[in-house]
């Protein structure tokens, strides 16, 4: 099957405003997500080229390091294909090669966390899309992954955190993983913490990173096919965010494609996957007037073709589109689109 090419530039405008009351310093950051790294390369993940995950993650780190203007990196979940010690150690070592600070939130693949009323790694949990115990009992827990990345946003046993980062902004990491489920959830305790945290930083620009989406980005998000890509109580989370006008952007990564929209004066940006076609990472720039997101491809041509073929063979992603060439084109247009998106930003008035 030949590779289908697509590229779009989208400009989205918000209500016009004058100089922001809250300082909005110019900042550039990268978003690395969905690397599905496996040290052995032998884990099956829907549509992902796991066998080349090490090469792709290394290329992402090298590309970020080659850029002089990147302030920090957000690792937006599903770093691992499967939670196992060697993969975790190697992934951490590769991220430690970054020359700028990096901050981590977890995805549902990043550690074993069986839900209540289900045995660890039960068939029921596995069917629900959650992580399962590895053969022979091998594997690492979410708490182990959290402790591995202490100091990279994470501080203590919780998966949510807040950090002041140069050049003078605040980054908030949310833990949207709902153990044993593919979809996300933010519980009442974390919501209360989020509200209080945003109030404490009301005079600073805030960027939020989470794994699961908080707004629908495609009609399929509102049906059974893709509803698991979102936080199941996303409305409650947005209600908290919209009380705090200093929140400029929410970055997520569970959709695996580059996309975004504006809701309640906040830019909701979805970043592509490193190991699912188009095998890319996001480079995001924010200044006083606008936010720009560009995805940066990582795969050489032969690997990119293989990745696209795997995407088009995926029941979860390609299977929801009509059969035939029109369906192929629609799938590729979605996953390979939004090469660059620009959002006009409003005045921030706490």
Ranges and model annotations:
Residues 42-51, 115-129, 133, 219-229:
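Short, flexible/disordered intra-domain loops and linkers
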Residues 5-15:
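Bacterial N-terminal signal peptides
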Residues 26-42, 168-178, 209, 267-272, ...:
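Active-site-proximal beta-strand elements of phosphoester/diester hydrolases
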Residues 60-72, 164, 170-172, 181-267, ...:
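His/acidic metal-ligating clusters that form di-metal
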Residues 288-350:
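A short C-terminal boundary segment appended to hydrolase-like catalytic domains
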Residues 85-195, 236, 262-270, 279-285, ...:
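Extended active-site neighborhood of metal-dependent phosphoesterases/phosphodiesterases
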Residues 18-88:
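N-terminal active-site segment of His-dependent metallophosphoesterases
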Residues 34, 77-78, 107-108, 174, ...:
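Active-site glycine-centered loops adjacent to acidic/histidine catalytic or metal-binding residues
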